[in-house]
């Protein structure tokens, strides 16, 4: 069956549970962009309340810190009501997807975009696909990407790999992302830490 599966609640990882990082990068606000990845009502609706609450709270803490520190903020959001051509192979794995109505498409209220934030239309797993995210980052002289949102092993991880492939240092915030299961979440963290990113917690970013 295609689409988002039923999700059972699980605890978000703590700093002690993170995989070891191979990279030793340091986050610098003047170099960074925060990517709020697909935090739309449609994608958060399947999350159990305890998981949703922790995810949104940590993402909101990140966003507030980024505003204070001068970190550029970017959002991805699917347009909804895609045509067959626009949907492409996505429909074979995820079905028709969301509608274009605000009930599906809006970013959740706690993370509402501000007037200076970049709004990117999301067409495939990677935030960089058919968007000008890379061009905007290059023009702004920013070469670090902090990632939060859903789903960890799908769009979040692929966007992380794409950033790395473009020599942008990704920082994957382990307790500000969520997934279909704890096992999927762990898989994304282990791959990122060993292959393409720094895996950190919200508290570590805010230190």
UniProtKB/Swiss-Prot annotation:
It comes from the Bacteria. Transmembrane segments: none annotated. GO terms for molecular function: isochorismatase activity. Pathway: Antibiotic biosynthesis; phenazine biosynthesis. Induction: In liquid cultures (aerobic), phz2 operon is induced by quinolone signal via 2-heptyl-3-hydroxy-4-quinolone (PQS). In biofilm (microaerobic), phz2 operon is induced by quinolone signal via 4-hydroxy-2-heptylquinoline (HHQ), a precursor of PQS. InterPro entries: Isochorismatase, Isochorismatase-like_dom, Isochorismatase-like_hydrls, Isochorismatase-like_sf. Its EC number is 3.3.2.15. GO terms for biological process: phenazine biosynthetic process. CDD domains: isochorismatase. The keyword Hydrolase applies. Substrate binds at residues 78, 87, 122, 151-155. Involved in the biosynthesis of the antibiotic phenazine, a nitrogen-containing heterocyclic molecule having important roles in virulence, competition and biological control. PhzD2 (operon phzA2B2C2E2F2G2) has a role in the biosynthesis of the phenazine during both planktonic growth and biofilm development, and in host infection during biofilm development. Catalyzes the hydrolysis of the vinyl ether functional group of 2-amino-2-deoxyisochorismate (ADIC), yielding pyruvate and trans-2,3-dihydro-3-hydroxyanthranilic acid (DHHA). Belongs to the isochorismatase family. This is Phenazine biosynthesis protein PhzD2. The lineage of its organism: Bacteria, Pseudomonadati, Pseudomonadota, Gammaproteobacteria, Pseudomonadales.
């Amino acid at each position: 069956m295609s689409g988002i599966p039923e999700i059972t609640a699980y605890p978000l990882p703590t700093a002690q549970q993170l995989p070891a990082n191979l990279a030793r990068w340091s986050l610098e606000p003047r170099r960074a962009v925060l990517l709020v990845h697909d935090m739309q009502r449609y994608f958060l609706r399947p999350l159990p309340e305890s998981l949703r609450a922790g995810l949104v709270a940590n993402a909101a803490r990140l966003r507030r810190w980024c505003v204070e520190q001068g970190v550029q903020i970017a959002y991805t959001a699917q347009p909804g009501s895609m045509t067959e051509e626009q949907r492409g192979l996505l429909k074979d794995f995820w079905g028709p997807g969301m509608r274009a109505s605000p009930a599906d498409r809006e970013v959740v209220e706690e993370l509402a975009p501000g007037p200076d934030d970049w709004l990117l239309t999301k067409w495939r797993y990677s935030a960089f696909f058919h968007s000008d995210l890379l061009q905007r980052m290059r023009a702004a002289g920013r070469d670090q990407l902090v990632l939060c949102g859903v789903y960890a092993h799908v769009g979040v991880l692929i966007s992380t790999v794409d950033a790395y492939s473009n020599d942008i240092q990704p920082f994957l915030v382990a307790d500000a992302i969520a997934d279909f299961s704890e096992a999927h979440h762990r898989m994304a963290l282990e791959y990122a830490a060993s292959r393409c990113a720094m895996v950190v917690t919200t508290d570590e970013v805010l230190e």
